[in-house]
């Protein structure tokens, strides 16, 4: 696997030496409101060179760790299933090589491809989901493969009690009714995350972490396809990431930056910092990092 031409800052390890591998899925063909998430991965990489590799929040530096950036997949915008198959194949390759796959979206549907790969290796997989939206619709305008349905499709893979949702503040009534029966849904913020993390640590179950950046309040992150008022702050998200990464996280993704929707550049800068902090939290040697 060869490195991308423009890598995320500090992620210049070789593939052989790396413990974490970045890969991008620039896909937004099912976006229901404002498109542009396909430009997210490239924007994050490009703008990262205005960011320091050092994190004052965690007193660690990206260059302390071995992280490889494999670049973006070439995905078929006309076929969601084809795109998901390509994402699954790349995630499976990284997992097979004993490394940690971290996916950059793209719209949230891309998560399904990565989860398909993860659940084949880890049948008892749990999913921790940060998002403004429940994403539990059975279909959206007749489409089963939609960013609005991604956690419903993931539920079909992992089953009841294996999906833990936080910051949810948008969805139709049927989604919340479904969640009450089949997932663990926490509205508005990260209340309950510390208790969940303790349970996940005790059980040592494998965990997939998916972060939709629209969990952030639009005042600090307006550049996303479906912004929702009332989100969490950057510091709240950082604290949540540092908390949940104590569990046995085996793969993760970061998605839904649409950089062209925020010409100030604030959203892209925020996404860069969230990615830096996530990489450091994952690779600081937490007991849970057990790929």
Regions found by a protein language model. Give the residues of each.
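Conserved alpha-helical scaffold segments that buttress catalytic/binding sites
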Residues: 1-291
């Amino acid at each position: 696997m060869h490195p991308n031409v423009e890598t995320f800052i500090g992620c210049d390890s070789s593939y052989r030496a790396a413990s974490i591998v970045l890969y991008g899925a620039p896909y937004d063909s099912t976006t229901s409101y404002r498109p542009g998430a396909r430009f997210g991965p490239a924007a994050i990489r490009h703008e990262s060179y205005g960011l320091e590799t050092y994190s004052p929040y965690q007193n660690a530096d990206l260059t302390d760790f071995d992280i490889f950036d494999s670049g973006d997949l070439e995905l078929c915008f006309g076929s969601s299933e084809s795109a998901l198959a390509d994402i699954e194949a790349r995630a499976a390759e990284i997992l097979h090589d004993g490394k940690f796959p971290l996916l950059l979206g793209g719209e949230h549907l891309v998560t399904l491809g990565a989860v398909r790969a993860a659940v084949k290796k880890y049948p008892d997989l749990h999913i921790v989901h940060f998002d403004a939206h429940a994403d539990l619709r059975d279909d959206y305008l007749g489409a089963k493969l939609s960013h609005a349905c991604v956690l419903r499709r993931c539920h079909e893979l992992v089953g009841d009690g294996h999906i833990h949702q936080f910051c949810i503040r948008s969805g139709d009534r049927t989604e919340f009714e479904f969640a009450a029966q089949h997932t663990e849904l926490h509205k508005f913020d990260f209340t309950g995350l510390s208790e969940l993390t303790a349970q996940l640590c005790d059980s040592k179950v494998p965990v997939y972490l998916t972060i939709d950046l629209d969990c952030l309040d639009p005042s600090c992150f307006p550049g996303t396809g479906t912004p929702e008022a009332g989100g969490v702050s950057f510091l709240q998200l950082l604290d949540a990431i540092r908390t949940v990464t104590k569990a046995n996280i085996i793969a993760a993704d970061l998605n839904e930056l649409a950089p062209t929707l925020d010409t100030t550049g604030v959203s892209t800068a925020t996404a860069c910092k969230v990615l830096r902090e996530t990489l450091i939290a994952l690779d600081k040697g937490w007991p849970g990092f057990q790929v």
